[in-house]
Amino acid sequence: MVLSLKEELSQRKKELLSPIKSVYFGGGTPSLLNKEELESLLEEVYLCYNVEPDAEVTLEANPENITINKAKAWKGLGINRLSVGLQSFKNDDLKWMNRGHNNKQNSACISDLYKAGFDNISVDLIYGLPGLKASEWEGFLKKVVSMGVEHVSAYCLTIEDKTKLKHEIENDKIKPLSESKQIEQFDFLRSFLKQNGYEHYEVSNFALNKNYSKHNRSYWERKEYIGIGPSAHSYRGKERRWNISNNHTYMSRGTKTQNWYNQEELSLSSIWNELFLTGFRTMWGVSKNEIKKLGGFTNQERKEVKALIDRGDLFDSGRAYVLSESGLLFADSLSESFFRVL
């Protein structure tokens, strides 16, 4: 697989000529790669692309895959940011979610990363879990703050179709948390982290001392990016592309004539819709310049803007239209109110 990834990196080097601000190893368990494999991939990235000296180089890792020796090796390779999937501090929930770690490993792995010299660590948490009490959620957040991590990503549990969770809920084996309790946990999340110095810069993301994720911010600001490997997505302004998901087909793509990726040209309506879908999620909002570039508001859309401002869900920052704290609760639905028919 590593050889195939390197081949794709080389094949596509002319697609992204601008300086690279972020390199991200994600989409599974990249921390299972050994030092030599990671080093080989990083060498190919730096060989083929113009990576900025202060680029953010992130590795996703699960607690059970982190040791101090591994962390030191990652640091030595130039990886300068870790994104760790803690998810929960409750062993029963971790087991139920089929995670491979426990509560003790959560604390131990973060400690090891700091001992190895990392100073930019992000952790993922999930709220809205069945049976999660307000006091437990508060306890989770207190632990995270006490760790001193620079970044927190917190997501509400989603119930996907054709999953064990969906089946157990439908058969009354598990009672989902009510929407009102989910909102309460989200409200506590942002107020508690704000009290402890974290900036709520995107619906699900909080940063200490402006340690925003360059990688995620590139998505929200619709910057061009290339995704390498099975199922990876790429974006180039007016075009989206995604690789096939089958590992075998992906790795044998050089010997077969069949397409190993799909792509679509984005219509002006699609670009407009994405501008609001992504922009309304962040504290920077939807840029007035970007709106102007795409032809500006219709009369009906201007009325919608005024209505949202009057209601207190939106404000005009001068440079952009930004959702208020109350508006952020409904970011997706409010962005959809500006969608145009494709």
Where does each model-flagged region fall?
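Short, amphipathic alpha-helical interaction segments positioned at domain boundaries
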Residues: L328-L342
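An alpha-helix initiation/capping motif
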Residues: I183, E325-L328
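Short amphipathic alpha-helical interaction segments
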Residues: G295-I309
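A short, conserved structural fragment
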Residues: I309-R319
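Extended hydrophobic-aromatic, low-complexity segments
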Residues: K288-N289, E301, D316
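Minor-groove-contacting beta-hairpin "wing" of winged helix-turn-helix DNA-binding domains
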Residues: A320-S324
